[in-house]
Amino acid sequence: MPKTAFITGANGLSGSAIVEYLCNTTTSDDWGSIIVTSRSPFKSTVMDPRIKFIALDFVNDVSSLVETMKEVCGAVTHAYFCSYLHKDDFAESYTVNKALFENFIAAIDKAAPKLENVTLQTGGKYYNLHVEPVPSPARENDPRRYGPFENFYFTQEDTLAEMQRGKTWSWNVIRPEAIIGANSQPYGLNVALTIAMYFLICRELGSASPMPTNQRYWEGTDDVSYAPLIADLTIFVSTRKSCANEAFNVTNGDYFTWRYMWPRLAASLGAKADSQQCFEKPMPGEGELQLDWSLAEWCKDKRKVWEDLCDRQGLPGAKATFDLAGWAVGDFLYQRTWSATLSVNKARRFGWTGHMDSYQSFVDTFDKFRQLGLIPK
């Protein structure tokens, strides 16, 4: 029997990547229906008659969710939770995202009698690598590290395991690093979009494009996760009994230093950056937070530069992209003074062989931004 997917957060990077993966790599004999949900109208880069959209907000109470979902979830076999509500305040973020998943898992368990698997996407923040230095590369069975803020990923994963006990369906957890990808409705957490806009503005100004970071992070090791690759692993593990009830890290499978990656990315968009970048501030100690300069401050007088560039290239619709960039998010990511990477050895042991050159993942994503009309050439 064909499987039926139920994908939440379908307008986000990971949710839309799963939709595209199923549409582009499977047939109706394998996946008969792809039910997608989001709070806002669904916008996809693919057209497929198997796609069915239902507007859902998992902030709502479980009973109302079940009432809406039971009409379309009778055949659902695989549910993929990719929803996330961003809040700048860590305590508020914990509260809303904890409730979001609790409502989802309670509702899908009641509304989908044929359910076989529920896959939850959390992320590298599960290891608290965004808060302090952690053993690197982080592995799925590393002891939990409890920082100054409650980690809603802990709660979500615990809720998933507890809900599954005694049920016929299995669970999986997917933990990516910083996600590199493009979607029709980007928002401020898209790292690649922010980088692309920064380079294009610097190119327009004829100025150099140094990385807004510190010397230790510049010279340290990093990794990223390409959205289509996340989708590939997600479908791989959720459809194999040998992978049931397991958590998996997912990255591109390579490591890099920003010192050498940043100039290559700049060059791909016609901007200039130097691997011998000089820093005004002294080398920080590991565990400190430091920026040589702030991207969020830098961007404050750059709107007109961006709009003039869009007008000159006949792409007025891309002007709105300026407000979609994550300027402050860039500061948050690049102020770290420690390397934080994930091991994908467990996924390899379970038979997954996915890999993507990280430089190419950025370049392909930049190309897709252009195709979507989000940035000029």
Swiss-Prot record:
Top-level lineage group: Eukaryota
GO biological process: griseofulvin biosynthetic process; terpenoid biosynthetic process
Molecular-function GO terms, alphabetical: nucleotide binding; oxidoreductase activity
Pathway per the UniProt entry: Secondary metabolite biosynthesis; terpenoid biosynthesis
Residues engaged in binding NADP(+): 89, 121, 226, 266, 268
UniProt keyword terms in alphabetical order: NADP, Nucleotide-binding, Oxidoreductase
Listed transmembrane segments: none
Reactions catalysed, as given in the entry: dehydrogriseofulvin + NADPH + H(+) = griseofulvin + NADP(+)
CDD domains (UniProt xref): 5beta-POR_like_SDR_a
Residues at the catalytic site: 226
Documented EC number(s): 1.-.-.-
Effect of deleting the gene: Impairs the production of griseofulvin, but accumulates the intermediates dehydrogriseofulvin and dechloro-dehydrogriseofulvi.
Applied biotechnology: Griseofulvin is a spirocyclic fungal natural product used in treatment of fungal dermatophytes.
Keyword Zinc carried by entry: no
Function according to Swiss-Prot or TrEMBL: Short chain dehydrogenase; part of the gene cluster that mediates the biosynthesis of griseofulvin, an important antifungal drug that has been in use for a long time for treating dermatophyte infections. The first step of the pathway is the formation of the heptaketide backbone by gsfA which is initiated by priming with acetyl-CoA, followed by sequential condensations of 6 malonyl-CoA units. The resulting benzophenone can undergo a spontaneous dehydration to form norlichexanthone.
Family: Belongs to the short-chain dehydrogenases/reductases (SDR) family. Highly divergent.
Protein name per the record: Short chain dehydrogenase gsfE
Annotated organism of origin: Penicillium aethiopicum
